[in-house]
């Protein structure tokens, strides 16, 4: 339990009908007594005047007192709900800060105290910020699932399985004279594979949750006049890019943030790729390649009136060779309205081929559906959860150590190495929920929160 008491405005700054001030810490009850002039009954709303030190009324509203541990932070908490004018809120906060032992809260400190007092784990605390920042209904639902503990429960299930497996492995190491060899009888190998499979499923859901939170970066690339800017306009639903018949019209990177059925996409239009003599166009082309290297997916635009080829290696082998293998690619044969080709997805092999007309919009819906599939969109976010980059990194490291442990078990029956890899895996999973976290990590996470949360 902390010894200091903190105060902050819990509602957004600015003018509003209602403004809420939150106080948390051992002095909360004293603050209530000094500001309202009476001892508040726990968990009852009382309509009272809020008084200055000399007894003059600063505002009037509802006061609520929650004694520990039955509060958001796990500490004594006071909430004053008054009028939402910035001057009124400022006067009340100054009044409370004048009481000995009370200080202004840091960003995210209320949520941090809730975490430190075991009222929630780290993923739930992060979900509060994600719920506030949600840019779509689907993102809000996913953040709420995390806040309610769904992500935490999946991680806890994995940790419990790891602990159970570690018992078997440690027993095989410590009692080699036993008749049953736990490492050789297939029990450990089977349980290990089950954990790997479950972790892969969690990683897949977490990837979709991260895309829901951060969005997928899609870069439109190709030669000049392939219709890249027209496709950007078609996807965004507005004239974001200038479209002309002059090659090299787009010389810089253009960005649009859109949602497809609640899934956020960062669509980036780039300069046409070619050997340019113009210095400004050269800079734009280099920037295009920089964006391509950082993309989650590349839409390779092809002018269908210039070639019948559909294989990108045949269309432009140098482009394919330069594209990083980790980046997914979709071939877009544009101007299908002029070539008479059937619109839509033609095959779903790697890479997927889509025929469309960026100018008329025909076939663009097929591309939208394809992009949703690339993001792992299932059409049902009720069971999903929100995830962050640090969660994905921790899950990736956990998977790597499980893989090492499996290789050591299968190749060498190396129980000691397997035991160590399982321990490290468990540590990485515990980082996600905060059971094992450095103070620096906690500071970075909570400092990104709103003040008053």
Curated annotation (Swiss-Prot):
K(+) binds at residues 225, 244, 246, 249. Binds 1 potassium ion per subunit. PANTHER family: TRNA MODIFICATION GTPASE GTPBP3, TRNA MODIFICATION GTPASE GTPBP3, MITOCHONDRIAL. GO terms for molecular function: GTP binding; GTPase activity; metal ion binding. Mg(2+) binds at residues 229, 250. Residues 215-376 form the TrmE-type G domain. It is found in: Cytoplasm. HAMAP family: GTPase_MnmE (MF_00379). Exhibits a very high intrinsic GTPase hydrolysis rate. Involved in the addition of a carboxymethylaminomethyl (cmnm) group at the wobble position (U34) of certain tRNAs, forming tRNA-cmnm(5)s(2)U34. Its EC number is 3.6.-.-. The lineage of its organism: Bacteria, Pseudomonadati, Pseudomonadota, Gammaproteobacteria, Vibrionales. It is an enzyme of class 3 (hydrolase). (6S)-5-formyl-5,6,7,8-tetrahydrofolate binds at residues 22, 79, 119, 453. This is tRNA modification GTPase MnmE. GO terms for biological process: tRNA methylation; tRNA wobble uridine modification. GTP binds at residues 225-230, 244-250, 269-272, 334-337. Its cofactor is K(+). It comes from Vibrio parahaemolyticus serotype O3:K6 (strain RIMD 2210633). Signal peptide: none annotated. Belongs to the TRAFAC class TrmE-Era-EngA-EngB-Septin-like GTPase superfamily. TrmE GTPase family. PROSITE patterns: G_TRME.
